[in-house]
Amino acid sequence: MLLSTQSIPIKKSVDDIWPVAGKRVLIRVDFNVPTSSGGIDDDFRIRSAIPTIRRIVDQGGICILISHLGRPTGVDYDTAHAEQEKRQTPVQLPNSRGKTAFFSGLRGDAKATILAWSSQREKAATLSNPYGSGKTAVFARLPEEEKRRLLLRFMSEHKEELFPQLGSAGYEKEFSLEPVAVKLAELLDQHVYFGHDCLGAQADIAKLRCGEVMLLENLRFYTNENSSDERKRMLMARILASYADVYINDAFGTAHRDSASLTGIPRVLQQGAAGYLMEKEISYFSKVLNNPPRPLLAIIGGAKLSDKMQVLENLLDCVDSLFIGGGLAYTFLRSQGYSIGTSHFEEAFVPFAQALPLAGSGRQVRVVLPEDHVCHAHTRPAEAPLTTTSANIPDGYAGLDIGPLTIQSITHLVRQCSSVIWNGPLGMFEMPYYAFGTFSIARVVSQSSAAKGTTSIVGGGDTASAMMKSGEAAHISHISTGGNASLELLEGKVLAAVAVLDNKE
C-alpha cells in the first residue's frame, strides 16, 4: 500500500550548495503568520525557518528572504512601473528655482552625494559634514545644465531614496511583513534589514555584507506572484532571480503553488535546493505514507467533506485505521441513517460517504466515526453544552465536538498503532466548551509518542495551532507548517515547487 510520494526524488539541500560565503542566497520562506494589531500572534512558521537562515549566515552568505502574507489586493508590476515613471517628472523642472527647490528637500547625505559628482571646486568645502548646512546654496550657484545632469544621475542611481513612495506599490499596512522582520531579528539575535519593495530592492541588496539578512516586502503586493498569466509570473521571477546567486525553497506551506517565487525563480536560475524545513517535511510525509511503522492510524477532521474527499480515498491505500471527525463526519453519519440535528452536512456527497466505509472494508481498513457528541442549539452559547450518549444528535442541536465515548475509542486506536497522521481539528477548538475533544487527542498522541516512540505527524494550519494551544506539542514527531501542501501530499500529489528543485546526485 504505497502512495505516489515515494516517487519524489531526493532533492539537493542546504548542505549540498557549499560554499556560500559572499554569495547572495535567496530563500523563499513561509512567513504567512497570523497577526493582529500589528503584532505576531503565532511565530511557529518564523521559528521553523531559523535553521536554514542561521546556516547561511554562519557560513558567510548574504541572506535575502522573500515571503507572502495574507491575501492583499495587489497591483500588476507593469501598471505600478508606469505609475512610477509618472512620478519621476519632478527632475524635469523647467527652471533653476524649481531644481534648487527639489534639491533642498533631499536629506543631507543625498545632497552630499550629488555635490560630490559636481565639477565645481567651490562645492568641496561643503562635503566635510554630510548633514551640515550650505549645500543648497552651493547647488543654486551651479550652471543650469550641471544641475540637470546631477539630478538625472541621482534619479537613475538612487531611485528608491529619491522617491520612497515608489517602494509602496500595492502596499496594505495589515499585510506588511515589516513586523515579521522585527520578530525575526529578535529570534536571530541580529539586525534584519527590510526591503520596502520586493521588486525594487537591487540597490538595498547591493549594500548587504556577508552574514547579513534582509527580508523583502510581501510578494503578493504584486499580482504577478500568483497571476494566471505565465508571462506576468515569469516577469516577476526574472526580477527576483536577479537578486540571487543561489536559490533555496524553505516554504513547504506554499509548495503546492505554481507561482513566480516558487516555480518561476528556479526555472530562471536553472537551479534550486530545498531548505532544512522543506527537506524535513518531505522526509516525514514520505516515510509515514510509503514505509510507516505499522499499524498506521489516520485521524482526519476539519469542516467540510468536499475538502478532504481525495485525501480520504488515497489514505485507504496506506492506513490500517481511519478515524473521521470534525464537521466532515456529519455527512458520514447522515449517510448511515443517524440523526445529526442542525449539524452542517453536504447532501451532494452522501453517496461518497456511504461508499467509503465499504471501500475501506474491502481493503482491510477500519473506518471509524464519532460515537457521541458535544453539541448546542447555538454555535456561541453562554451556558454549558449538551453531551449525547450516542451518535444521534437531538433536533435543534448541532455537533461542535466529539464526546467522551469517542475520545475513549480514539485513545484505544492511538495506543494500538505505531504511526499516526492527524489532519484537521475534531471540534470548534477555538471556543473553550468545544476544545476538550481536540486537546484530549493531542494529549494522547503526544503521550504515545513519548512513551513508546509512536511516529506522529500533525498537518494543517488549524491542527498545528490546536496542538500548540493544547500544550502537547513537545513530543510530537513532526508538526507540519503546511496546510494545503500537506493535504496534497496526503492526496498522493507531487508538489509543483518541489518538482522544480534540483535532484540530489
From Swiss-Prot:
Catalytic activity: (2R)-3-phosphoglycerate + ATP = (2R)-3-phospho-glyceroyl phosphate + ADP
Residues bound to AMP: 303-304, 308, 327, 399, 430
Localization (cell): Glycosome
Pathway: Carbohydrate degradation; glycolysis; pyruvate from D-glyceraldehyde 3-phosphate: step 2/5
Positions of ADP binding: 302-303, 308, 326, 399, 423, 429-430, 462-463
SUPFAM superfamilies per record: Phosphoglycerate kinase
Annotated binding of CDP, by residue: 302, 307, 326, 424, 426, 429
Keyword Nucleotide-binding: yes
Binding site for Mg(2+): 303, 307, 462
Domain of life where this protein originates: Eukaryota
Quaternary structure note: Monomer.
Protein family membership: Belongs to the phosphoglycerate kinase family.
Name of protein: Phosphoglycerate kinase, glycosomal
Gene: PGKA
